[in-house]
């Protein structure tokens, strides 16, 4: 009898603990609007941004004007993976995969086996993606993606000052990348309002990632650019999944979203009638370009070679000189050094 009583007490204690944990952290795929938690990582969707969110008094002309992308070029963007060849490549690739797997587990996301093909439905499971979960994922991704370009540009800026010489146009492209990623984030936060816990994760993530990236870039900048190249591959994969979900009518709330003014002021080929899908297409196209740029920079001699995307050389054929803005590239996985005339 004593053993039976003890066993029941343990079961009751376990049930109480489980109910308490569910209160703190409801199921990631729960659609109950009243399901709240102090650890909620959901993002509230803003269909019609109120006028006070416009921030028009702070808007300036873009420091790096965005090129115009055609719908056809944006549709043609697809997931491409650069196979790791060196030990540094493998470390960078596995590092990105580890970070992504950890974030996927926390947010209840599962990567489709074929991001370019038909998606498997995970309705009714923790992997079902809702509009709120997608916004959380996009906001966190862009808060991280804006760090590497600025950190790398800062280090190269100091390097140029210290050695009293030019940096051969690396800084401009890196600053452009950081600015572009920040515009992605500024646009998303007009569409979604993240929870305080999501903001806390962003604060902590930026503090750790920015300092770690800074230290590694001082020692091995090539590894850092390769890491960012693989990170951008995952960004293209994520946005491709999002577009597929929109096309499959799994995210009906996004059909009613009115794009904020900041979006068409930056992407000049958008307007007030553009859809959320149009915006995601442009953002995915940007990420694909960052993928090409960083994989290419990782293939260069870090202290000797010019940045071929920004510093052009006359009389060099187009097939041997990357274009900084064109999406029609023969090497979306990055240019090898021998494919360019430096």
Curated annotation (Swiss-Prot):
One cellular component (GO) term of this entry: mitochondrial inner membrane
Molecular functions per Gene Ontology: alternative oxidase activity; metal ion binding
Claim: Cell membrane is one of the keywords in the record: no
Subcellular location, principal: mitochondrion
Chain positions recorded as Fe cation 2 binding sites: 181, 232, 287, 290
Membrane topology per record: Multi-pass membrane protein
GO biological process, any: alternative respiration
Record has Lyase as a keyword: no
EC number, UniProt record: 1.-.-.-
Subcellular location: Mitochondrion inner membrane
Top-level taxon in the UniProt lineage: Eukaryota
UniProt name for this protein: Alternative oxidase, mitochondrial
């Amino acid at each position: 009898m004593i053993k039976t009583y003890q066993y029941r007490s343990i079961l009751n204690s376990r049930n109480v603990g489980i109910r308490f944990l569910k209160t703190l952290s409801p199921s990631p795929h729960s659609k109950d609007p009243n399901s709240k938690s102090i650890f909620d990582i959901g993002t509230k969707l803003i269909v019609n941004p109120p006028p006070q969110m416009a921030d028009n008094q702070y808007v300036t002309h873009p420091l790096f004007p965005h090129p115009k992308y055609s719908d056809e070029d944006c549709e043609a963007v697809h997931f491409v993976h650069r196979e790791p060849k060196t030990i540094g490549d493998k470390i960078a690739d596995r590092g990105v995969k580890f970070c992504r797997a950890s974030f996927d587990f926390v947010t209840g996301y599962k990567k489709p086996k074929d991001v370019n093909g038909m998606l498997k439905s995970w309705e009714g499971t923790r992997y079902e993606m809702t509009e709120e979960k997608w916004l959380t994922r996009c906001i966190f991704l862009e808060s991280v993606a804006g760090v590497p370009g600025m950190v790398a540009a800062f280090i190269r800026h100091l390097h140029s000052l210290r050695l009293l010489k030019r940096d051969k146009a690396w800084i401009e492209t890196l600053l452009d990348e950081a600015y572009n990623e920040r515009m992605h984030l500024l646009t998303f936060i007009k569409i979604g309002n993240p929870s305080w816990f999501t903001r806390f994760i962003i604060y902590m993530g930026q503090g750790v990632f920015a300092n770690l990236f800074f230290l590694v870039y001082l020692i091995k900048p090539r590894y850092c650019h390769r890491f960012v190249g693989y990170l951008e591959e995952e960004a293209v994969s994520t946005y491709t999944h999002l577009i597929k979900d929109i096309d499959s009518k799994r995210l009906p709330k996004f059909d009613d979203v009115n794009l904020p003014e900041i979006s068409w002021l930056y992407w000049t080929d958008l307007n007030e009638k553009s859809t959320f899908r149009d915006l995601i297409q442009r953002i995915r196209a940007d990420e694909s370009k960052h993928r090409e740029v960083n994989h290419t920079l990782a293939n260069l001699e870090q202290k000797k070679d010019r940045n071929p995307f920004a510093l052009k050389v006359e009389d060099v054929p187009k097939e041997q000189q990357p274009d900084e803005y064109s999406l029609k590239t023969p090497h979306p996985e990055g240019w090898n050094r021998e494919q360019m005339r430096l």
